[in-house]
Amino acid sequence: MSFAGRPPDTRKRASQGIAFFRLGVLAALMVLAPWASVEAAPIEVRFAEGAAHGLLLVGLVSGETVGHGDLLQTAHGDRVESRLILRFKDGSVHDEHVVFSQQRVFTLLSYRLMQRGPSFPETVAVSLDRKTGSYNARSARDGKEQESSGSIELPADVYNGMVVTLVKNLAPGASETVQVVAFTPKPRLIRLEVTPAGAQRVVAADLARQATRYALKPRLGAALRLFATVMGMAPADQECVILTEDVPAFVRCDGPLYVKGPVWRIEQTVAR
């Protein structure tokens, strides 16, 4: 369903929440949490991002391919624009656009996410902008539309759409806790713990390489975690594998792209 052509004075404010949580490449969560920031230090730049075009496969962990994707990235000075587009065989699309700066530390400047098609339970469009201090979240399902918009002050350690970039910049063996913004439909800050989870042997052609698995765990308070579990809204853990020899490189990430969604594997591939 398209959101176009709707007069501003007829927009509906959502009364029930849906959450959109993106992990670098990747998540949408539905949670109920107060807007309360326990701000941590932003992530330092160890490896600056540059121009890149990555080819991706989208599949199930069983090996079945369900789609393909592109990671398109450009850099202008210390400003980087990164776009992840996943195209599913059934015509569904996951499209997210991140703009960030990398002057000593990584800083999220703006973020947009769009999901549509039969692979997703609803059409979703989300945007955040640090400079204007604004957000907008829209969804459509079964002919019904919901929308929330307003002002938002983003802490320095908010990193929607940048998890893979952050993991590549962690020191060997280091863990970090950052924040992401989820929508219910009003914005809520969620703490995300990123922890190394062991070595992983990967193979490129016939060459074995050493990689590291990272666990990405949303952290809720005990009472909220229990409530979210009972209500079927508990955010799922994710896992990313990063090649950690010399200069880090993305290998794959496993996790759902929406609440209660299937675990999809997004991995690097090559042109043949």
For the regions a protein language model found, what residue spans apply to each?
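Acidic, serine/threonine-rich low-complexity disordered tracts
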Residues: 41-131, 176-272
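Intrinsically disordered, low-complexity regions enriched in polar/acidic and amide residues
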Residues: 7, 15, 145, 175-178, ...
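Bacterial N-terminal signal peptides that target proteins for export
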Residues: 9-25
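Bacterial N-terminal signal peptides
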Residues: 22-34
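Sec/Tat signal peptide C-region and signal peptidase I cleavage site
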Residues: 35-40
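Surface-exposed beta-loop interaction hotspot
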Residues: 140-175
